[in-house]
Amino acid sequence: MLIIDIGNTNIKFGICINNQIIQTLRISSQPRRTADEYFFFLNTIINQLNINNFTITHIIISSVVPSITKPMIELSTHYFNITPTIINNQHADICNIKIDLNDKLLGSDRLASIIGAVTLYPNKNLLVISMGTATVFNLISKERSIYGQVITPGAHIMAQSMRQHTALLPEISQIKVNKVVHNTLFYAIEAGVYWGYIAMVEGIVKQILHEENKDLHIVATGGNSILFIDHKNFIKNIDPDLTMKGMIYLHNMLFNK
């Protein structure tokens, strides 16, 4: 099976065999790419991986970028002769998940992550933190009701915003920084973004725990979740592939596997 997770910053492809993700590939989200370009990229990588007896029989897509969804559907139908499954809010009902929010429309990536979390950690009150372009804190009851949320900028937006709104500050990369105080401009900005993001997430989690006043099983996913590998004092599980795992679980429910 081919899993396609289309985000605002990156597109993540997952190659899945027997319900196991054996390889993930990531490229930047560029709305002008064509189905032909995506096929060339995928075909080249899959051939290089030399996976024995791998044939794409199913494709499932999560997308928050409609302009990229269209060429991905074309890729699926034209090159693989497959009608892909496109995740939408109706799939919450199939997975016995209730969206108990005033705004019922969830991003498909959020829904997939929540499907993954409630499947992996059943009968628990959950706080699922999706750390992508935006950082979304999802509160889910042990009865599978999504009842609360907090949404903040992601680390990438924080760094990008500083660069866009200043004339002289340099562009930085998103990496772990061991200490907060530096004597060079570049490392001072890197440290500010990294430690500022860590402090923001920790502070919001602390406030959520105070307001909820109950045990929450905390799970982090998304590209920025790896920044918290050394900060697991309050995050129980860090799983960058949680969204894709949720897509696998949904696929299995839809096709009774």
From Swiss-Prot:
Keywords: ATP-binding, Coenzyme A biosynthesis, Cytoplasm, Kinase, Nucleotide-binding, Potassium, Transferase. A monovalent cation. Ammonium or potassium. Substrate binds at residues 107-110. Pathway: Cofactor biosynthesis; coenzyme A biosynthesis; CoA from (R)-pantothenate: step 1/5. GO terms for biological process: coenzyme A biosynthetic process. It is an enzyme of class 2 (transferase). InterPro entries: ATPase_NBD (IPR043129), Type_III_PanK (IPR004619). It comes from the Bacteria. One of its GO terms (molecular function) is pantothenate kinase activity. Its cofactor is NH4(+); K(+). ATP binds at residues 5-12, 133. Signal peptide: none annotated. It catalyses: (R)-pantothenate + ATP = (R)-4'-phosphopantothenate + ADP + H(+). Its EC number is 2.7.1.33. SUPFAM superfamilies: Actin-like ATPase domain. It is found in: Cytoplasm. Homodimer. NCBIfam families: baf, PRK13318.1-6. Catalyzes the phosphorylation of pantothenate (Pan), the first step in CoA biosynthesis. Belongs to the type III pantothenate kinase family. This is Type III pantothenate kinase. It comes from Ehrlichia ruminantium (strain Welgevonden).
